[in-house]
Design a protein with these regions (language model features):
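Extended hydrophobic blocks
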Residues: 1-37, 47, 57, 73-74, ...
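Structural recognition of the beta-strand scaffold that forms the well-ordered cores
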Residues: 39-41, 65-66
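Flexible loop residues that form catalytic
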Residues: 43, 69, 135
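Histidine-anchored nucleotide/phosphate-binding helix
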Residues: 46-64
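Short internal beta-strands
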Residues: 63-71
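Short, solvent-exposed loop/turn segments at secondary-structure boundaries
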Residues: 75-79
Length: 219
């Protein structure tokens, strides 16, 4: 999909984007069912941590698992890893430390799932069901990865934000931090999820997705 510049082209662009956004977020279930763990994919977004804490406080799961290695933003946030950052944010919301389990080595979605589940097993926490929490556009791939690696686990996906809210948040945060990312760059990152779903399915990392032809063409 080409990037548009003037307002008329921009409106046309966002209209064309809508099916892609709907496809990427159609797995979200709010509120999610009660599960054995809230499984959080590494991030440096405050709202992801806050939402995981909210689900815990609503008694939707007895544990929060956070998986995430170091990212570029960690240095700016005075955190060693994404998991470290998110744990600090969750503890601020008065979640008991012993209910937060961290995994610090995963550097991609596949590792998040494998290392996170291994960490839970090492602590003798049996997982039959999980609520997946991540940025909204990432959740479909998180779900597909989990289904491939642990097909026996019952899964649900949940997100604090709708896709529109997420996009607005990202652009506002970029302005506040004087980030050089443009609206187009944010959108390109999100649309790239379609390619990732195809590529990682071919590698055998995730469950193959039934992606409509119009979505592939639009992306």
């Amino acid at each position: 999909m080409g990037i548009k510049t003037n307002e008329a082209e921009k409106n046309e662009y966002f209209t064309a984007l809508k099916p892609i956004l709907n496809f990427l977020t159609d797995c979200i279930e709010n509120p999610p069912p009660k599960s054995d763990v809230i499984f959080v994919f590494g991030s440096t977004k405050h709202y992801v941590a806050e939402y995981a804490a909210k689900l815990y406080l609503e008694k939707l799961a007895p544990y929060i698992l956070i998986s995430g290695h170091k990212s570029e933003r960690c240095n700016n946030l005075y955190a060693k890893t994404e998991a470290d950052f998110m744990k600090k944010e969750i503890i601020k919301l008065e979640i008991p430390d012993e209910k937060i389990i961290t995994e610090y080595n995963a550097s991609n979605t596949l590792e998040n799932v494998i290392f996170g589940m291994r960490t839970l097993a090492d602590k003798n926490i049996k997982i039959n069901s999980a609520i997946l929490v991540a940025k909204p556009f990432h959740l479909k791939r998180c779900l597909a990865t989990f289904k491939k690696q642990f097909p026996q686990v019952k899964l649900s996906c949940s997100s604090k934000m709708t896709f529109t809210e997420y996009l607005s948040y990202e652009l506002t945060e970029n302005e506040k931090s004087k980030n050089n990312k443009t609206e187009n760059e944010v959108i390109k990152r999100i649309i790239g999820e379609i390619d990732r779903l195809i590529i990682y399915a071919e590698k055998g990392d995730i469950v193959k997705q039934d992606i409509p032809e119009n979505i592939i063409i639009a992306a």
